[in-house]
A protein has these predicted regions:
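Active-site-adjacent, His/Asp/Glu-enriched structural segments that form or flank metal-binding
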Residues: 124-196
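Basic polycationic patches enriched in arginine
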Residues: 4, 13, 25-26, 44-46
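His/Glu-rich zincin catalytic helix
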Residues: 42-111
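M16/MPP (pitrilysin/insulinase) zinc-metallopeptidase core fold and M16-derived inactive scaffolds
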Residues: 89, 93-145
């Protein structure tokens, strides 16, 4: 008799299938081998994960604007994360990856080269839901404080002509996924929101309560 086992994890147990005979016939015996892994799985099931802050925002009432998503203390420095919401969640079509990718390249280049905010720019990148972007800046900042910067940034994207920075096989992992025309259109659309930010009946600088 030759015992040949096939391992498959099922929940917290490791199951071994066998026996298998030398002529290729299989028996119907199943045996369970309990391992330390089962205890790990039990602990994982008992661990309750809290809802993260961004999932507590009322996305039904959220409209395009500039919002403070969170502030984190890192050493003696405060990092402010801004929510640059460009479309109405669950109401308008989300942005496609090509135009978001283009906005990311242009915005990151602009911000990193900015005289005042270049050294304070930590990150600019897309939201997974494709309704906007996150901007991380060093400093304890408010939405209104960066409005001039946002107007400057999206005017730059709206008016941009030429080759998108970093749009080459050498510089980017997906350089063909670009759409400058749509990026310019979306930037112009968002710019109108920024320029009349105080004219809306609801705040576009603070999350809906």
């Amino acid at each position: 008799l030759i015992i040949r086992c096939v391992l498959a994890q099922d929940g917290g147990r490791i199951w071994t299938k066998g026996p298998a005979f030398s002529d290729g016939r299989r028996g119907g015996l199943w045996c369970a081998v309990h391992t330390a892994g089962s205890e790990i799985m039990k602990k994982r099931r008992r661990f309750k994960m809290e809802k993260i802050a961004s999932f507590t925002i009322d996305h039904i009432r959220l409209q395009p604007g500039v919002y403070v998503s969170r502030k984190d203390q890192v050493g003696d420095q405060v990092i402010t994360t801004f929510d640059l919401r460009m479309t109405s969640p669950n109401e308008e079509p989300v942005m496609n990856t090509a135009e978001m990718h283009t906005i990311e390249h242009l915005a990151a280049t602009f911000l990193r080269n900015h005289k005042e905010y270049g050294s304070r720019t930590i990150y600019f990148g897309p939201m997974g839901c494709r309704t906007g972007f996150y901007l991380l800046l060093a400093g304890n900042l408010a939405s209104r404080e960066i409005l001039p910067l946002m107007v400057e940034l999206f005017a730059f994207i709206r008016d941009f002509e030429g080759e998108v920075p970093g749009a080459s096989a050498r510089d980017c992992g997906n350089y063909l996924d670009m759409n400058l025309g749509m990026a310019k259109y979306l930037a112009a659309r968002y710019l109108k929101v920024l320029e009349q930010i105080d004219s809306y009946p609801e705040s576009r600088l603070e999350y809906p309560q």
